[in-house]
């Protein structure tokens, strides 16, 4: 009986190992939710990207600030939290609801909300660090500026279906980068 108990304890510890490497306890479901959100974004596509080529734009995703190779572990959670919050804000706007299938949009936003809750839980665990490093504030500003450019683009294009399609594809890339960052940080430990 004692061996079985010890074995189960080891299994429990090992099952949480990948999520503990970030210095916080992200639920194991976090990666699954992230993948599901990416899948939902693909399903939300209403137009062929080819029909919206004239509307394509480089929003300047801050890869150098958020990129998987440059960002440090201590910066990751606040930056990923900001990225997720900005995506959620964008897709819960009243203009967004007119652009997408309501069921897919609700599922996507629910997943984003859960991802955000996971990340905010990690932020609370890191609360003992009072001041943000300058590089972290710089990264947060870069994420906010990036989403400001997206918001301005949508406004300039009057929230047209093609504008939303361009933004959907851009958000997929941003969310995919965040998933890669988490995977890299988990591997580093």
Swiss-Prot record:
Name of this protein: Interferon alpha-6
Disulfide pairings: 24-122, 52-162
Annotated family: Belongs to the alpha/beta interferon family.
Domain of life where this protein originates: Eukaryota
Annotated glycan sites: 101
Note: Not expressed in fibroblasts upon virus induction.
Keyword annotations of the record: Antiviral defense, Cytokine, Disulfide bond, Glycoprotein, Secreted, Signal
An example Gene Ontology CC term for this record: extracellular space
Function: Produced by macrophages, IFN-alpha have antiviral activities. Interferon stimulates the production of two enzymes: a protein kinase and an oligoadenylate synthetase.
Keyword Mitochondrion: no
Example GO BP: defense response to virus
Main localization of the protein described in the UniProt heading: secreted
Pfam families in the record: Interferon
Gene that this sequence comes from: Ifna6
CDD domains: IFab (cd00095)
GO molecular function per UniProt: cytokine activity; cytokine receptor binding
Compartment annotation: Secreted
């Amino acid at each position: 009986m004692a061996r079985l108990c010890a074995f189960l304890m080891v299994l429990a510890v090992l099952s949480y190992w990948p999520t503990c490497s970030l210095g916080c306890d992200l639920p194991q479901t976090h990666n699954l939710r992230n993948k599901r959100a990416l899948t939902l974004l693909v399903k939300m596509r209403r137009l062929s990207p080819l029909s919206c080529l004239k509307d394509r734009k480089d929003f300047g995703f801050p890869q150098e600030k958020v990129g998987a190779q440059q960002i440090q572990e201590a910066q990751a959670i606040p930056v990923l939290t900001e990225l997720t919050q900005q995506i959620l804000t964008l897709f819960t706007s009243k203009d967004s609801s007119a652009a997408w299938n309501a069921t897919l949009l609700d599922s996507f936003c629910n997943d984003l909300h859960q991802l955000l809750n996971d990340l905010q839980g990690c932020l609370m665990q890191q609360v003992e660090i009072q001041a943000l490093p300058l590089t972290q504030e710089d990264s947060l500003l870069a994420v906010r500026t990036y989403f400001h450019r997206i918001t301005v683009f949508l406004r300039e294009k009057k929230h047209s279906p093609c504008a939303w399609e361009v933004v959907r594809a851009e958000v997929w890339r941003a969310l995919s980068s965040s998933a890669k960052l988490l995977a890299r940080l988990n591997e580093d430990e």
